[in-house]
Amino acid sequence: MTPSLANFLSSLVWGAVIVVVPASIGLFFLSQTDRVDRKL
């Protein structure tokens, strides 16, 4: 694997981590605090 390809892949991974981790944490806390009755 070339160094540029390795840098590209690592930037993709870090971009996904930076986007996905805070979003999932935020959704988790929102679902914990949002106690709406969703039964139909």
UniProtKB/Swiss-Prot annotation:
Alphabetically ordered keywords of this record: Membrane, Photosynthesis, Photosystem II, Thylakoid, Transmembrane, Transmembrane helix
Membrane-traversing stretches: 8-28
Swiss-Prot/TrEMBL GO biological process terms: photosynthesis
InterPro entries per the UniProt record, alphabetical: PSII_PsbX (IPR009518), PSII_PsbX_type_1_subfam (IPR023431)
Top-rank taxon: Bacteria
Membrane topology: Single-pass membrane protein
A GO CC term attached to the entry: photosystem II
Coarse class of the protein's main subcellular location: membrane
Subcellular location(s) per record: Cellular thylakoid membrane
Function: Involved in the binding and/or turnover of quinones at the Q(B) site of photosystem II (PSII). PSII is a light-driven water plastoquinone oxidoreductase, using light energy to abstract electrons from H(2)O, generating a proton gradient subsequently used for ATP formation.
Family label: Belongs to the PsbX family. Type 1 subfamily.
Subunit comment: PSII is composed of 1 copy each of membrane proteins PsbA, PsbB, PsbC, PsbD, PsbE, PsbF, PsbH, PsbI, PsbJ, PsbK, PsbL, PsbM, PsbT, PsbX, PsbY, PsbZ, Psb30/Ycf12, peripheral proteins PsbO, CyanoQ (PsbQ), PsbU, PsbV and a large number of cofactors. It forms dimeric complexes.
Designated name of the protein: Photosystem II reaction center protein X
Gene responsible for this protein: psbX
